[in-house]
Amino acid sequence: DFGGLPAWLLKDRNMRLRCAYPEYLQHVSDFYHRLFEEIGDLQQSEGGNIIAMQIENEYGSYGNDKEYLRYIEKLMLDCGTKVMLFTSDGDDNSMLSGGTLPDVFKTLNFGSRASEIFNAMDRFHENTPKMCTEFWCGWFDHWGEEHHTRGSDSVAGEIKDFLDIDASFNFYMFHGGTNFGFTAGANCYEEYQPTVTSYDYCALLTEWGDYTPAYYAVRELLLKAQNLPETELPASPELQTIGKVELDESTSLMSNFDNLGERHYVPLPESMEYFGQNSGMIYYETKLEQIYDPRELRVANVHDTAYVY
């Protein structure tokens, strides 16, 4: 949700995200300096397993501020990056133009048509090694939509295309996951598309770590491509039945607001970000002490969902 950025950034009513806005850059700098205290020694150059680091993420889908991208690049180097830097974007010219830097390795994100898409990259920047940083095994599931599925033959067929043109790829996702609480986020194009709690994504391993038909198909293909013998796989994870849970007590939500949150008095409704709240809900209450004629209640600028009592 919100790209992992903290909600309190928007308490600055002039805040501009993912660009060369000084206050935003200062917060990014603070974060990176603290981050590298944790990951600096984990780089391949130091004997670790971090082989490369990415500048931003699909920035060409959002903006084209080259000063900002150069700032992030320099910040990462100043913080101690010793491995290769790269960018990762969609395949059309506007995305590649906005999200890349001339002297930084460029990678692509897509889920099919590898040969065609890498040809588009060649037109944009010749002789670039072919790398798909996000090979999409599936897609997001949104509330109210059908569950996205993708056949194992389709996934394996795309991987074969990568192998046929000597391209590299990274699975997105290899292991299904879970968006806990309110962290799922959403897409928002012509309409708002909230993502469900599950991040299954038709990954090769399920959300609970079990094998899928696509896993076996891709495994067979890769073993054959590398002339490797088939070895025994770890056992599938054991599942358990939780059983019946008896609930014999309850309480009113509205009678417990003071136990669940902090009360604030403000002249006008403020957003969650104003209070530094990343997710969840806010209960707004007001008293109409004057006499009003009956009229339609209008609530503007609701972002996500509002319940009116």
State where each predicted segment sits.
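Contiguous N-terminal and early-domain "leader" segments and peripheral loops that mark the onset or edge
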Residues: 1-9, 91, 99-114, 254-260, ...
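Substrate-binding/catalytic cleft of secreted carbohydrate-active enzymes
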Residues: 2-171
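Carbohydrate-binding surfaces of carbohydrate-active enzymes
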Residues: 24-40, 46-54, 60-61, 65-69, ...
